[in-house]
Structure formats: C-alpha cells, structure tokens
C-alpha cells in the first residue's frame, strides 16, 4: 500500500482490512482514496464510503446454520472493551500470556517449531476459540505508537552467539515473574534448547515493557490495541462488513 510506504508502517493488509471482496457503487470517486497520505485518513474515507454505501468491503467467514452480517471498525463503536488484568509467565514452557478482562488472553511464543529461531508472535485465546494473531513487527509498531521501548529483533542472533547473556536475562524474568529460586533456575538450565531461549527471551522482554508502565489507562490502551490488532479491529484497521 502506498500509505504504508509514506508512513513507514509495517502491517499485514488483512489486519488493515480482511475483506474478501468489495462492492463499488457505479461512479465512485477513487480520487478520495488516492489523495490520502496517512493511514488514519485513508481509514476515515473507507468508513465514510461504507456508511454512504458507495464502497463496501465484506469479509466471509465459515457459516454454521444461520448467517449474520455485522459492521466492524466503525470508529464511534470502538470504545475500550478490554483491560489489562496481569500476566502469566510459566516456569517451564517457552510462552507467556498477557491477561485481559473477560477471560481473554494473548499467548506470546515462538510458533516456528522445536529447532527454529523464528515465528515469535501472539495469538488471542478466547473462551471458545483462537481469535487472531499478531506478529512481532506489529507488536513493536504499537509499542512505538505509545512511545514505549520495543522488543529487540536480535533474539535469534543472540541465542546463537551469546546464549549465556540470553540465559542471564531470562533468569531475571524467572525470578521476578515466575518466583523461582536459584536452585530451580539452575535445574531448568539443563533442560532447555535454543528455540526455548529464543521464545522465552522475547516473552520476558515484552512482559517487562508492559509491567514497567505505571499509568493504568496507558497500559489498558496498549494491551487493548494488541488485542484489537490481532482480531483485525484496531484503530489501524479500516471499516468492513463481516458475514459469518
């Protein structure tokens, strides 16, 4: 997208708008879209066009029984619906969870496989099913939006070249977030592999950033944006209809 290049935004187009097809009114003025220089400005045009019924994107989801059609990402309806309730930081597994109100949580971990140092991302876990994913790039984009530090992107190279410093950093997380003592940490050291180090390092760094936020409202806004982005409903996303 041209606007992405102008604003230097790295975003999956399906997270911006997951529409599978578009209905366009005859004579629609595409100049309204072409003239926009910012993502928020483009999103405003998309929303106005949807409300005018001149340009409508529709996302198709698997339907069971009946079907429902609903509008998504209409700005006036995007009130805060999730708040931060804490985190879960396992003593043994490579993942960590950001906990949100309503029983929702975002699991962050590497999904690249047992021997891979790639694929770190978050996945929204709801009461009934997984509800979307957010990779490290968009996670850092949202952190930057709030003026916060980002999760370093050098985890793989650090694991390969300096695993001792990686383990030392994770050990701080194990003591702070998992409440482990030194004997427990030393015992765990012999049981983990490179993939575990790669994943747990970034989990530790992300939770550290979130926990360092003292302003409760800011923290709530941040985690909700992570949740909304993963479920294609963030302020970076544009309006569409969802048929399911």
What is the meaning of each model-derived region?
Residues 1-244:
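Short, positively charged
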